[in-house]
Regions:
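Structured catalytic core of nucleotide-sugar glycosyltransferases
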Residues: 1-110
Length: 110
């Protein structure tokens, strides 16, 4: 099987509009430094804040970012499931959007 990307980073989120720009910037910095072919799949699990609008803005600026939006909150398992289904990377890594997981650790996971 041939993969178009080295890594798929699946991020499930709910009401994380404030952390998304910083998280994406941090991931991009690490991916560029490591030279990975990657994608970021953000699954908005029915957020009531501006998370989906921010995901759309980020994906317009970076073709490596894709978003999936749920109409209501289905839970983290459902969000991850749909993120995994959409993933095109050889390796899939999950992260939370609240900056509790450091993108600096991604190379160790890969």
């Amino acid at each position: 099987m041939t993969y178009s990307k080295d890594l798929s980073i699946v991020i499930s989120l709910y009401n994380e509009d404030e952390s998304l720009p910083e998280l994406v910037s941090w991931i991009e910095k690490v991916m560029t430094a490591e030279g990975y072919r990657y994608e970021i799949i953000m699954v908005d699990d029915g957020s009531r804040d501006k998370s989906w609008e921010i995901i759309k803005e980020l994906s317009e600026r970076n073709p490596y970012i894709r978003g999936i939006s749920f109409r209501r909150n289905y839970g983290k398992s459902a969000a991850l499931y749909h993120g995994f289904k959409a993933a095109e990377g050889r390796v899939v890594i999950t992260m939370d959007a609240d900056l509790q997981d450091s993108p600096d650790e991604i190379p160790e996971l890969y």
